[in-house]
């Protein structure tokens, strides 16, 4: 959340007391929507932990998800360098767009957003009927089998690289990534945890 100093430095006069607020998925990085906040909306957002805007058409505060239940739970808020725009990192509950899309800017999803969506799909297969998909069958086969597949795909990826076959390397690396994501989900981990560890090591 914003510090007291950051709040005091916000330039409300410059934006006629309606500050643009860009909402971004805290994990996938996908830009979800943009709205406007007055000082009261920002205060409510900070207090409740749910993104609340000021509606220019209705001339009142409105909390995203108040009617649909698709709230935007705040992870953090950052001001830009001019203190006249806010970036709000969130974890959404359900789709953000009223059309049912994850983002109001869909289908402009980034590669990272796709990876997150794939991870969510793989997670949903953990409790599915093993006969319904290869992924569900893989989960049902147990951790040892999943780990074995990661090892096999790792070797095949390395072999593809040694013969300079870029097409095969791409295919094998894709298989490796898929099975690694399945293994992480099997262990109740997600890719953002791995990224966090890499970031920690980079900052040392």
Swiss-Prot record:
Pathway(s): Amino-acid biosynthesis; L-histidine biosynthesis; L-histidine from 5-phospho-alpha-D-ribose 1-diphosphate: step 2/9; Amino-acid biosynthesis; L-histidine biosynthesis; L-histidine from 5-phospho-alpha-D-ribose 1-diphosphate: step 3/9
InterPro entries assigned: His_synth_HisIE, HisE, PRib-ATP_PPHydrolase-like, PRib_AMP_CycHydrolase_dom, PRib_AMP_CycHydrolase_sf
Assigned protein family: In the N-terminal section; belongs to the PRA-CH family.
Region annotated Phosphoribosyl-AMP cyclohydrolase, chain positions: 1-114
Source species, domain of life: Bacteria
Gene Ontology cellular component list: cytoplasm
Gene3D superfamilies on file: MazG-like (1.10.287.1080), Phosphoribosyl-AMP cyclohydrolase (3.10.20.810)
SUPFAM superfamilies: all-alpha NTP pyrophosphatases (SSF101386), HisI-like (SSF141734)
Entry EC number(s): 3.5.4.19, 3.6.1.31
Record key words, sorted: Amino-acid biosynthesis, ATP-binding, Cytoplasm, Histidine biosynthesis, Hydrolase, Multifunctional enzyme, Nucleotide-binding
Protein name as it appears in the record: Histidine biosynthesis bifunctional protein HisIE
Entries under PANTHER family matching the protein: HISTIDINE BIOSYNTHESIS BIFUNCTIONAL PROTEIN (PTHR42945), HISTIDINE BIOSYNTHESIS BIFUNCTIONAL PROTEIN HISIE (PTHR42945:SF9)
Top-level enzyme category: hydrolase
GO molecular function per UniProt: ATP binding; phosphoribosyl-AMP cyclohydrolase activity; phosphoribosyl-ATP diphosphatase activity
């Amino acid at each position: 959340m914003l510090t007291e100093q950051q709040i005091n430095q916000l330039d409300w006069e410059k934006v006629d007391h309606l500050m643009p607020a860009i909402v971004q998925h805290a994990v996938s990085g996908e830009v979800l929507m943009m709205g406007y906040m007055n000082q009261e909306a920002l205060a409510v957002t900070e207090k409740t932990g749910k993104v609340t805007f000021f509606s220019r058409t209705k001339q009142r505060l409105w909390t995203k998800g108040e009617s649909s239940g698709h709230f935007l739970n705040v992870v953090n808020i950052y001001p830009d360098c001019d203190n006249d725009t806010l970036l709000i990192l969130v974890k959404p509950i359900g789709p953000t767009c009223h059309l049912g899309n994850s983002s109001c800017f869909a289908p402009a999803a980034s590669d990272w957003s796709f990876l997150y969506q794939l991870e969510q799909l793989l997670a949903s297969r953990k409790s599915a009927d093993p006969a319904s998909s290869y992924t569900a069958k893989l989960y049902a086969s147990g951790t040892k089998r999943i780990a074995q597949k990661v090892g096999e795909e790792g070797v095949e990826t390395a072999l593809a690289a040694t013969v300079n076959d870029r097409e095969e390397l791409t295919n094998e690396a894709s298989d490796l990534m898929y099975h690694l994501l399945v293994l992480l989900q099997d262990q109740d981990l997600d890719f953002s945890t791995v990224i966090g560890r890499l970031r920690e090591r980079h900052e040392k």
